[in-house]
């Protein structure tokens, strides 16, 4: 799942949201793996750079290639959206209720007051929620946790009885998704409906957050602030995905 920071008039953009979604074979859970944008990685054809630069250099194909090289796992599908997509899909389901680990004030990038705990947000407010990072304790890392919390909230609302039993809301959400999501050619409408139906028994506690492993913060040779990749940790993450045992990985991981 790629969220681009493109705004009107932009020719190139970096990806501010990079979440790898893993659904186990038994469809019992949904794992959301956040890849921090400042991970210092090798980008094919471009040398060392921040992970989100791969999207600016070569779009989704190069981002996928960079991530596959990082964890050693093939990525099956790509879904892209932008800020307008976040807003439109949130409004289509009537807003979302999301948990914030930290409060943030209206003076920050968000422009709204977010309290620590549960917040009910409309589309514009949700967009502010996922963009804020300057007031958060770990900057982009904390923002990534907010983004995963939002994705979870939107997913749970979209498959809730309030939406799936309401023909009007279903139509509104489908229309918003169709207009604001770009998917790879293998993700047909029938495929997406089938996957959504297969996840009908998933509840909030079944949506699990994981942050891709890094050893800490540092500086690149050209003076950029970076997240230092935990190479053994990335290999362990890739093995867990490939072997469909992310539950075991999560229980032993030192990064929440």
Predicted regions and their residues:
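Non-catalytic, solvent-exposed segments at the cell envelope interface
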Residues: 1-256
């Amino acid at each position: 799942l790629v969220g681009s920071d493109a705004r009107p008039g932009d020719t190139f953009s970096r990806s501010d949201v990079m979440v790898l979604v893993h659904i186990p074979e038994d469809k019992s859970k949904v794992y959301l793996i956040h890849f921090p944008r400042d991970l210092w990685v090798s980008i094919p054809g471009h040398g060392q750079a921040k992970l989100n630069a791969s999207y600016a250099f070569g779009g989704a194909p190069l981002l996928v290639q960079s991530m596959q090289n990082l964890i050693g796992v093939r990525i099956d599908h790509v879904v892209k959206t932008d800020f307008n997509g976040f807003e439109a899909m949130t409004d289509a389901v009537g807003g979302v209720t999301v948990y914030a680990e930290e409060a943030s004030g209206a003076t920050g990038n968000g422009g709204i007051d977010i309290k620590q705990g549960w917040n009910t947000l409309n589309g514009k407010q949700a967009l502010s929620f996922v963009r804020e990072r300057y007031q958060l304790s770990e900057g982009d890392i904390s923002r990534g946790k907010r983004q995963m919390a939002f994705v979870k909230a939107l997913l749970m609302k979209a498959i809730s009885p309030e939406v799936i039993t309401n023909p009007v809301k279903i139509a509104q959400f489908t229309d918003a998704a169709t207009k604001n999501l770009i998917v790879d050619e293998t993700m047909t409408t029938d495929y997406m409906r089938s996957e959504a139906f297969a996840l009908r028994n998933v509840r909030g506690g079944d949506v699990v957050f994981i942050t891709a492993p890094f050893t800490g913060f540092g500086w690149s040779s050209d003076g950029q602030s970076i997240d230092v990749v935990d190479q053994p940790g990335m290999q362990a993450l890739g093995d867990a995905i490939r072997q469909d045992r992310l539950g075991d990985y999560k229980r032993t991981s030192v990064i929440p």
